[in-house]
Amino acid sequence: MGYEKSIEAMKIAENLMPGGVNSPVRAFKSVDTPAIFMDHAKGSRIYDIDGNEYIDYVLSWGPLILGHKNEQVIKKLHEAVNRGTSFGASTLEENKLAELVIERVPSIEKVRMVSSGTEATLAALRLARGYTGRNKIIKFEGCYHGHSDSLLIKAGSGVATLGLPDSPGVPEGTAKNTITVPYNDLEAIKIAFENYGDDIAGIIVEPVAGNMGVVPPKDGFLQGLREITNDYGALLIFDEVMTGFRVGYNCAQGYFGVTPDLTCLGKVIGGGLPVGAFGGRKEIMDKVAPVGNIYQAGTLSGNPLAMTSGYETLSQLTPESYEYFQELGDILEEGLKKVFSKHNVPITINRAGSMIGYFLNEGPVTNFEEANKSNLELFSQMYREMAKEGVFLPPSQFEGTFLSTAHSKEDIEKTIQAFDTALSRIV
């Protein structure tokens, strides 16, 4: 398997874009391998410009829950393109997707479409602050909510720490209103509210953390957040940009039975096109302009192509789709445990719906500190060997793998065999 064309393309790209990429993880730095340039894809398969074929578990980092180039989605997109790409005015496609989102997401009575997950979380925080009249937000260590200034912060030391900037260019004055605590730690939340409760506007949380690998909530964690925010008059914000429609038919909140005040969506609701959304109770959402005075706007928000792709994607998902994901996940988990045991390599597997995370340590993995104990050198080796076997995994230990309705049981069996072959060359 060669990467000659990708290597040459990257040399050109590095003179055109920072690091040659438009999103850092695509540089493949953490796995010490050439960045791969993709050419086309269909179903569960993706092909690079060197002609290499892979079973794809990245799926554009989650959006493609139906697999690549779904016929119904592509057909309707062609029809939408022929009508025009953007109008700067409302379209019926916006109504259709909004109705479907409201129907399926328990917390959402009204929704505002945007063009990215970062936009959605940024707007949700502004709305939470405007609605409550408070300043501080709680987030969790290892949870990623986009690249807005107030969320790019470190945890520091201690149980509940006022944030310091985690990226140059983020003013300390901005970061100081973000409190970071360990994921799955209700005691830390209680301490934070005891110290700052009268100025905490809300908690933003991934109901299943997806950017430190896949880390589900402990029993009672999400319910505890709901109770504490209720007690203090703060808002509970679920960032379901990744988990939305991946963990369950009614998103993670439906799966776990905990209803937040606001929900952020993205990825799947665009079916592979740029999209985001935030929504919640009517009384909160009616504070957003033009009804209320909390401003948010976007030139391409609700554009007809993304709305069409999202509607056609969600329309094909049924409760049976999630039963299928469970079946595939069971086969993959059982197979991986057998293979890793055979080679005496420790593995911890975490799952939630169509999201699967594996950590090369003894486990358990319930927070960012435990995720960081994974064997990153072995992960890097394994990534390279799996690519040779025709399996495209996320090039980072701290990203989850994704299943689609296009994946077959044969794909899963081939993947398990690929892990066996890869490990036999490494250990």
Swiss-Prot record:
Domain of life from the UniProt record: Bacteria
Record-linked InterPro entries: 4pyrrol_synth_GluAld_NH2Trfase, Aminotrans_3, Aminotrans_3_PPA_site, PyrdxlP-dep_Trfase, PyrdxlP-dep_Trfase_major, PyrdxlP-dep_Trfase_small
Keywords: Cytoplasm, Isomerase, Porphyrin biosynthesis, Pyridoxal phosphate
Pfam families named among the record's database cross-references: Aminotran_3
A GO MF label: transaminase activity
Chain positions found as N6-(pyridoxal phosphate)lysine: 267
Organism: Staphylococcus haemolyticus (strain JCSC1435)
Protein location: Cytoplasm
Protein's UniProt name: Glutamate-1-semialdehyde 2,1-aminomutase 2
Entry keyword annotation includes Cytoplasm: yes
KW Isomerase (keyword) present: yes
SUPFAM superfamilies: PLP-dependent transferases
EC number, UniProt record: 5.4.3.8
Swiss-Prot/TrEMBL catalytic activity: (S)-4-amino-5-oxopentanoate = 5-aminolevulinate
GO CC entries: cytoplasm
Pathway: Porphyrin-containing compound metabolism; protoporphyrin-IX biosynthesis; 5-aminolevulinate from L-glutamyl-tRNA(Glu): step 2/2
The family this protein is said to belong to: Belongs to the class-III pyridoxal-phosphate-dependent aminotransferase family. HemL subfamily.
